[in-house]
Design a protein with these regions (language model features):
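Carbohydrate transferase catalytic cores enriched for Leloir-type hexosyltransferases
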Residues: 1-229
Length: 229
């Protein structure tokens, strides 16, 4: 029986520090560790050459960031379609919001992690936000399967994209059996927030709200990567 070929796009790992970067790394590892024998997973890049080895990673240089966006556009609309064609992929998975316009016979599975680009436009420049949303829409057709990371995001995306879109929520997993020796001394009772330290996350409001909690034994722990923007 012929295996179903699934092409997984790893390109965005060149620039992703936290959220999407973690998602891509864990997805790639899961495909290798838990993939079905009925599927053949093909990766667009060698992940070991991408992780922590890019000038685009968390750069505060606007020129470098724009160079990445130009290369990203060329890759998505020209190079990735060629990879789809030559790999004879049945499915292509894009974990970074954007799928190419041409996927030939391959069905598209696109991960929209949330609806922030539509809900919080003030966090992005007008032109960039309009451009990015246009790219998202360009990569979607009637057969696109959209994956998001929570039911909350699913409801928001249905309101934005329409109920005719196929949207499924798949929560990100956690290995409760895996333990590690940590040097971090966490309190006995605490609330944990995991996410990058970005202005748009509005962590200041979270800290102010926690300050109102009348429980001296409860602590707030923030964990995540520092992002330049």
């Amino acid at each position: 029986m012929k295996k179903i070929t699934v092409l997984v796009d790893l390109y965005y790992l060149k620039a992703a520090v936290a959220g999407i970067g973690s998602y891509i790394r864990e997805f790639e590892a899961s495909c290798n560790d838990h993939g079905s024998n009925d599927f053949k997973y093909v990766f667009t890049h060698d992940i070991n050459k991408l992780v922590g080895n890019s000038i685009f990673l968390n750069s505060n240089n606007k020129i470098i960031r724009w160079i990445f966006q130009i290369r990203y556009l060329i890759y998505k609309q020209i190079q990735l379609p060629l990879k789809i064609l030559f790999s004879k992929a049945d499915y292509v998975i894009c974990p970074d919001y954007i799928a190419p316009y041409f996927t030939f016979k391959a069905k598209r599975i696109t991960v929209l992690h949330d609806s922030l680009f539509w809900d919080h436009k003030k966090n992005y420049s007008f032109l960039w936000n309009k451009y990015f949303i246009s790219l998202i829409n360009l990569g979607m057709n009637k057969g696109t399967q959209i994956i998001t990371t929570s039911n909350y995001s699913k409801k928001n995306l249905i309101k934005i994209l329409g109920s005719d879109k196929s949207i499924s929520s798949v929560y990100q997993s956690f290995n409760f059996l895996k333990t590690s020796s940590s040097n971090y001394k966490t309190p006995e009772n605490y609330l944990l927030h995991i996410g990058s330290f970005e202005k748009r996350k509005d962590l200041i409001t979270l800290v102010k709200a926690f300050k109102l909690v009348d429980d001296p034994n409860l602590k707030l722990v923030l964990a995540g990567a520092q992002i330049i923007n």
